[in-house]
Amino acid sequence: MQAFKKKLQQLVYSFSTEDRYADYDEEAANPDVAAGVERSITESNHGSQIQLADYVDGSNPSGNEGINEALLAWRHIDNWTSQHNPDLAATLSDPCTRHDINNAEKDLDIIFPASVRASLRLHDGQEDLVSMTGTGGLFFGLQLMGLDEIVQMTRTWRNVAENLERKNHELQIKMDKHQELNGTTVDLPNQQKGYGKLENQDYKAMDPNLQRNISQNYKKQFKLPDIPDQHSVPPLAIQQVYANSGWIPLVTDNAGNHIGIDLAPGPKGKYGQVILFGREFDTKFVVASNWGDFLLSFANDLELGNWLLIDEGNDQFAGEGELVFRDKKSNGPVRDYLEVLVMRSRMKWNSFTERKLPEEPKRTVSSSQGSQNTVEPAEQQETALTVDETLDEKNDTSLSVDNTGTKQEVKDPETTGTKTGSSAKAEDNLPKTSNPDEVMADGADTQETSKHEQNESTNAVENTETSQEGAVETSEKPEEKPKKQSKKASKKKGKKDEKKDTDSKTKEPEVEEETESHLANSVEKLKDDFENVAL
């Protein structure tokens, strides 16, 4: 009798309640049917009569963002679908009740963000997609999931996450045991019949390379399925795992990929952010900060005209066609909406990094300037050698002009030695005139000898002049060789030889002045001696 009574109450409850997910609760004698929002057709299209108290979480004010965006987005979506694709509008389900949402949260042990609650209180996903041909998912072919589907798919992904975590844990335990037993006994990974631990005495009688071979293949026996490394965009915004119990799917492509909310974000993520995850997404993407912003971006695409209705068949009763994405501005081809969301997520992250790092170009410029300004020692030596070579060429030209113009300049101290030697010979040839009385006593003999000596002195002076000219010419020739040698030596030895050349050049004018003064004195002395002899 009690069982029949319970069945009758469940039947009455199913006809009288607006709950779509929650079942009849025997403990609640008076289920909160009135708590569901009574809406007319216009209210279902616009959602204007829904009170915020129906889905606002008073205990978590920070989780209430996105409510206004969700209400505004659904107003535009309902208007657009009723105008352009009534068949698509007919697939949108009736709203959930608060009782449905509370039971779903209890089953999943979560609390939906306020924007998700608002969306479920307007439309509980899509239905009748199979019976209504010519229509597809609301989000450019992606289906909006109902509350019942959300709970079932969340449990499925949680089972995947738990299995992966359990396998990782088992693998870690077995690896630890293998490391402990390595060297004493061999723990074979295969636990079938006929396999077990080998004692030390048995192990010695077997192949000595057995333990090494087992250790090399040990990881292969317990290797997980081929799951590549997981990433996220932006980095660290989403946990880098294949599946997580905090990811709640809300939209599906019916192929294992989802758009959902993240209730367990990464270190740099945000609670309630909208992400892309699934079988084909080893890199997870953040597409919106909350569910309301995502709905508003979809409504914006509809208002901008980024859509097409494609009817692949000729059936007149098939409806207007399936809604697909096409960028109106670029007049591009039809694109998958998941690919569009991935592209937008990458572009948003790239623009964010460019704004966040404005100093990076400056640093590169400064480093390049610094590298240009810094000259290596070898380069400095080469530049110094080229400058010195040009200076040497200028000095060569100036010296050649001086040598051709004035032959009396003497630049080699060796020439001074020849000149002084010739003057000394001339002085030896001259007679001693220290006693004038002897000269007067001799008379005519002295005059003859004086004439003879005068001729000899003039010849000596001419010989000295010719010797001077020869000395100047010889001094000019050896000077060219040291300069050529100094150029070669400066290229090889560098700055040390250059300093020596500059020192020798500074000493040359001093030597020239000394030789000129000494030559002038010797010439004047010869003139005085000649005058005395003549007298």
Swiss-Prot record:
Residues 354-535 are annotated as: Disordered. Belongs to the KNR4/SMI1 family. Residues 484-494 have a biased composition (Basic residues). Signal peptide: none annotated. Residues 354-363, 474-483, 495-509, 524-535 have a biased composition (Basic and acidic residues). Residues 364-384, 397-407, 456-469 have a biased composition (Polar residues). Gene3D superfamilies: SMI1/KNR4-like. Coiled coil: none annotated. It holds the Pfam family SMI1_KNR4. Disulfide bonds: none annotated. This is KNR4/SMI1 homolog. It comes from Kluyveromyces lactis (strain ATCC 8585 / CBS 2359 / DSM 70799 / NBRC 1267 / NRRL Y-1140 / WM37) (Yeast). PANTHER family: CELL WALL ASSEMBLY REGULATOR SMI1. One of its GO terms (cellular component) is mating projection tip. InterPro entries: Knr4/Smi1, Knr4/Smi1-like_dom, Knr4/Smi1-like_sf, KNR4/SMI1_regulator. GO terms for biological process: fungal-type cell wall beta-glucan biosynthetic process. The lineage of its organism: Eukaryota, Fungi, Dikarya, Ascomycota, Saccharomycotina.
